[in-house]
């Protein structure tokens, strides 16, 4: 039982302190307390100075224990410290006034017994805890909290995090706080690096969101402006325990799996090497001291801190039978703590592991650790807590009851994918798009079973019925979902089985990742985006790339996986990674998609097998476009043809002695073309078109137009493919000839061409390889923002036209450009042209993949 410490020995003060600690009351109104303003000198009462007024929910206590009152707190003047929460005033009692002067504050009692003041209990942690003495405990065994102020600058995609919780829908039992549920990769929060999942947001700028409804917190974040100041509360992780372990290798090697390292972080922002799996029957399990979540510091005399994944693998492989390990074990957290994660080891196991084995014939599978988790038999007794930081878990303690979720469609649809619908097995959420409506709401989860959409019962629906219901749902969609991870695991296990089969076949050669016999090397251009972090089946460290990137495939002998490195304008990258083979890309997509139809509204793909708008894997939307013939009507040209999956295009390096023509396609192309010629008249020019129209008096032949003597001659030249594009206006023919383009190119100028996508291939056939750049609008709203005179209908038409353009000619683009302003787009285009203006270029190769 805790001892109730108080500021003096008088009975009145003791009673106030005791009751403040024991009673759980509603939070006081602003102004009840005078608290130092965490953002500067106090200019008024508590309503505008600081974030006082939190109930005991802010610092939850262990069930059944009597919390220690917070009667003294020492404030170290750091300029941005947020003071601890004062005790709740007790009705009917004289309330101690908080003294805000001097370096600290304390309950000011009415007696003269100040001699006991220095014995009062310490305060909880404050902002900038590095300025304080360590190990300041909160409520005894309840753990420790840290308060931090974080200033974020709103980026192109917002603040880059998702929230959940509030008085109306608590994220944590008995806590109405607003919690961070996801940090979106590449967003403002991720780039800043300080905000973390499970942080509790207490204040947004000057708005107190500690106890508000969810919508109020969302509103505060939306209205916060370009620079947002957050005050957050988080658990202080218990200090690590350093342990030395000697392991004797057994038949299964060391018996554990690892993940992490520089360039392959297991936890964002952390280069450490983590133990992710204890193999049943292995040396580590028999020894009993290593656990999932332990951090490897050293192997024998080799330091494993801040090393690459491959270096850690090599250090573990190159050991004798007796191995010395130095590990850091996370501190223990009490089992009854409502904020703590469930027992990870008794509930989950990770998939794409790195099995350490001393058997040289088996090699080493240095896989990227998968973030996907699957149920597995318990590895430790359920009463034993596995001290994994909460952000390392794929599943939290989450309600299994049906939940009502309201989503509003955005430019990416609803932002999630579904699987299932066969033999009445149910419809499940399989993927949440980062930054999409589902992700930003924080309410829908992977593994949720969709029970209904806008009142339409989907409990026994087929996949097609569910996809149709979601497609017809309108802008505001009400979903009833139920978290069923056990049922969803059957779909995950299919991926797992596929990966295991692939790895077993790969091991037969002893290479550890790919079959190395008959190595085949080639260069390819990527026709889709690939994100290695979303591929749970990788047999080794993957290599991410974007559409248009040149890849040197150094080993294409394996049917499923290739080894490759990126080729940049400055040479080849040293990093080698695994990418999916052409066969794997095409097989995976054809198996998943019965038909592929371009979704012009969202710029994504639509299928009768998956929810429209998203891809359920690591492939970008670009690889799903159907290849069509050179015609402006992409839909009619693709009818009756089997859609081809765009994966890789074989290329070869070629030396050229001309300035490549430039074709800009998409919105704002005319403005970009004009600006290029105006700003760089010595680098860019235009060619002289041909026409059968009679010459006017003020026109010069060869300068204004090439005036063709007869229509028959021009028609013949068009039939002989001497023109890249031609058309008719007022019974006169107009066109751009290959020779006109070549004349500009051979003078050392980039010929700016205002033509359609059909001209790209015709120029390639004429050995004039253009720099073809597509300006891809981010959304209809983005178009309207860049041209405020446009109506929604006009912007919508432009957006649809751009999406159809990408569908039809995407495989011929040199690069795709996006931006939030014309200036940003223009600068990117200039850089691309500069990068592509060398004497050596990559051109399509006749080689077959």
From Swiss-Prot:
Keyword DNA-binding: no
GO biological process: chemical synaptic transmission; establishment of planar polarity; establishment or maintenance of epithelial cell apical/basal polarity; regulation of postsynaptic membrane neurotransmitter receptor levels
Keyword hit for Repeat: yes
Gene3D superfamilies reported in the protein's UniProt record: 2.30.42.10, Guanylate Kinase phosphate binding domain, P-loop containing nucleotide triphosphate hydrolases, SH3 Domains
Span of domain SH3: 519-589
GO cellular component, one term: AMPA glutamate receptor complex
Annotated positions of the Phosphotyrosine modification: 705
Biased composition (Gly residues): 41-53
Lineage: superkingdom: Eukaryota
Region of interest (Disordered), residue spans: 32-101
CDD domains: GMPK, PDZ1_Dlg1-2-4-like, PDZ2_Dlg1-2-4-like, PDZ3_Dlg1-2-4-like, SH3_DLG3
Post-translational modification Phosphoserine, affected residues: 157
Domain called PDZ: residue spans: 149-235, 244-330, 404-484
Keywords: Phosphoprotein, Repeat, SH3 domain
InterPro entries per the UniProt record, alphabetical: DLG1-4_PDZ_assoc (IPR019583), DLG1-like (IPR016313), DLG1_PEST_dom (IPR019590), DLG3_SH3 (IPR035763), GK/Ca_channel_bsu (IPR008145), Guanylate_kin-like_dom (IPR008144), Guanylate_kinase_CS (IPR020590), P-loop_NTPase (IPR027417)
Domain Guanylate kinase-like per the UniProt entry, residue ranges: 659-834
Biased composition (Polar residues): 57-69
One annotated GO molecular function: kinase binding
Function text: Required for learning most likely through its role in synaptic plasticity following NMDA receptor signaling.
PANTHER family: DISCS LARGE (PTHR23119), DISKS LARGE HOMOLOG 3 (PTHR23119:SF28)
Family the UniProt entry places it in: Belongs to the MAGUK family.
Subunit structure: Interacts through its PDZ domains with NETO1, GRIN2B, SYNGAP1 and APC. Interacts through its first two PDZ domains with ERBB4. Interacts through its third PDZ domain with NLGN1, and probably with NLGN2 and NLGN3. Interacts through its guanylate kinase-like domain with DLGAP1, DLGAP2, DLGAP3 and DLGAP4. Interacts with FRMPD4 (via C-terminus). Interacts with LRFN1, LRFN2 and LRFN4. Interacts with FLTP. Interacts with GPR85. Interacts with DGKI (via PDZ-binding motif).
Name of protein: Disks large homolog 3
Native organism: Mus musculus (Mouse)
The organism's taxonomic lineage, starting at the top: Eukaryota, Metazoa, Chordata, Craniata, Vertebrata
Gene: Dlg3
């Amino acid at each position: 039982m805790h001892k109730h410490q108080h500021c003096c020995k008088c009975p009145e003060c003791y009673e106030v302190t005791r009751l403040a600690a024991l009673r759980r009351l509603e939070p006081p109104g602003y102004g009840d307390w005078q608290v130092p303003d965490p953002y500067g000198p106090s200019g008024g009462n508590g309503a505008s100075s600081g974030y006082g007024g939190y109930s005991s929910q802010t610092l939850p206590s262990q069930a059944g224990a009597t919390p220690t009152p917070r009667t003294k707190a020492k404030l170290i003047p750091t300029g941005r410290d947020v003071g601890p929460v004062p005790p709740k005033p007790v009705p009917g009692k004289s309330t101690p006034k908080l003294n805000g002067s001097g370096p600290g504050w304390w309950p000011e009692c009415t007696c003269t017994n100040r001699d006991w003041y220095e014995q009062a209990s310490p305060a909880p942690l404050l902002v900038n805890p590095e300025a304080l003495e360590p190990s300041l405990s909160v409520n005894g065994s309840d753990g420790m909290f840290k308060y931090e102020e974080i200033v974020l600058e709103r980026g192109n995609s917002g603040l880059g995090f998702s929230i959940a919780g509030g008085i109306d829908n608590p994220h944590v039992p008995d806590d109405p706080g607003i919690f961070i549920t996801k940090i979106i990769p590449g967003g403002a929060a991720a780039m800043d690096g300080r905000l973390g999942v499970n942080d509790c947001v207490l204040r947004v700028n000057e708005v107190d969101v500690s106890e508000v409804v969810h919508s109020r917190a969302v509103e505060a974040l939306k209205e916060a402006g370009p620079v947002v100041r957050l005050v957050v509360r988080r658990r202080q992780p218990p200090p690590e325990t350093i342990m030395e372990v000697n392991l004797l290798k057994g038949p299964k090697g060391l018996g554990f799996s690892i993940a992490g390292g520089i360039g392959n972080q297991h936890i964002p922002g952390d280069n450490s090497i983590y133990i992710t799996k204890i193999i049943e029957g292995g040396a580590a399990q028999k020894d009993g001291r290593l656990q999932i979540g332990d951090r490897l510091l050293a192997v024998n005399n080799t330091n494993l801190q801040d090393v690459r994944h491959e270096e850690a693998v090599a250090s573990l492989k190159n050991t004798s039978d007796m191995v010395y390990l130095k590990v850091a074990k996370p501190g223990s957290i009490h089992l009854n703590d409502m904020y703590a994660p469930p027992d990870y080891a008794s509930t989950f196991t990770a998939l794409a592991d790195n099995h350490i084995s001393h058997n040289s014939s088996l090699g080493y599978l240095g896989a990227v650790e998968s973030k996907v988790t699957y149920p597995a038999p318990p590895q430790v007794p359920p009463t034993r807590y596995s001290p994994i930081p909460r952000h390392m878990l794929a599943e939290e303690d989450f309600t299994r009851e049906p939940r009502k979720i309201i989503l509003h469609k955005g430019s990416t649809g609803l932002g999630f994918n579904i699987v299932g619908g066969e033999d009445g097995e149910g419809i499940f959420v399989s993927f949440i798009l980062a930054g999409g409506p589902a992700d930003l709401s924080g309410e829908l989860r992977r593994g949720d079973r969709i029970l209904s959409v806008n009142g339409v019962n989907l409990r026994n629906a087929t996949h097609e019925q569910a996809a149709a219901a979601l497609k017809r749902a309108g802008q505001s969609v009400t979903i009833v979902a139920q978290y069923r991870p056990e049922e969803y695991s059957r779909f995950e296990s299919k991926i797992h089985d596929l990966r295991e089969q692939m790895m077993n076949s790969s091991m037969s050669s002893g290479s550890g990742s790919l079959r190395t016999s008959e190595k085949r090397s080639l260069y390819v251009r990527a026709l889709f985006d690939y994100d290695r972090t979303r591929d749970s089946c990788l047999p080794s460290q993957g290599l991410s790339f974007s559409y248009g990137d040149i890849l040197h495939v150094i080993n294409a002998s394996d049917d499923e996986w290739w080894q490759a490195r990126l080729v940049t304008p400055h040479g080849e990258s040293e990093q080698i990674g695994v990418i999916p083979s052409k066969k794997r890309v095409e097989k995976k997509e054809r198996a998943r998609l019965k038909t592929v139809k371009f979704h012009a509204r969202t710029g994504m793909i639509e299928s009768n097998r998956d929810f429209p708008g998203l891809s359920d894997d690591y492939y970008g939307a670009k690889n799903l476009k159907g290849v069509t013939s050179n015609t402006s009507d992409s839909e009619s040209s693709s009818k009756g043809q089997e859609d081809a999956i765009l994966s890789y295009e074989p290329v070869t390096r070629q030396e050229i002695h001309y300035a490549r023509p430039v074709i800009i396609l998409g919105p704002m192309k005319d403005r970009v073309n004009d600006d290029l010629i105006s700003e760089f008249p010595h680098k860019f020019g235009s060619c002289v078109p041909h026409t059968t129209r009679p010459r006017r008096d003020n026109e010069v032949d060869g300068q204004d137009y090439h005036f063709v003597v007869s229509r028959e001659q021009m028609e013949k030249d068009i039939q002989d493919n001497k023109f890249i594009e031609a058309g008719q206006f007022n019974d006169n023919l107009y066109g751009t000839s290959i020779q006109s383009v070549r004349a500009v190119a051979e003078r050392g100028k980039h010929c700016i061409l205002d033509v359609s996508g059909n001209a790209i291939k015709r120029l390639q056939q004429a050995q004039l390889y253009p720099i073809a750049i597509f300006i891809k609008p981010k959304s209809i709203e983005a178009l309207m923002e860049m041209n405020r005179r446009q109506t929604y209908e006009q912007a919508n038409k432009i957006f649809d036209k751009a999406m159809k353009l990408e569908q039809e000619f995407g495989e011929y683009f040199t690069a795709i450009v996006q931006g939030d302003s014309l200036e940003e787009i223009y600068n990117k285009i200039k850089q691309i042209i500069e990068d592509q203006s060398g004497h050596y270029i990559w051109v399509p190769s006749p080689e077959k993949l």
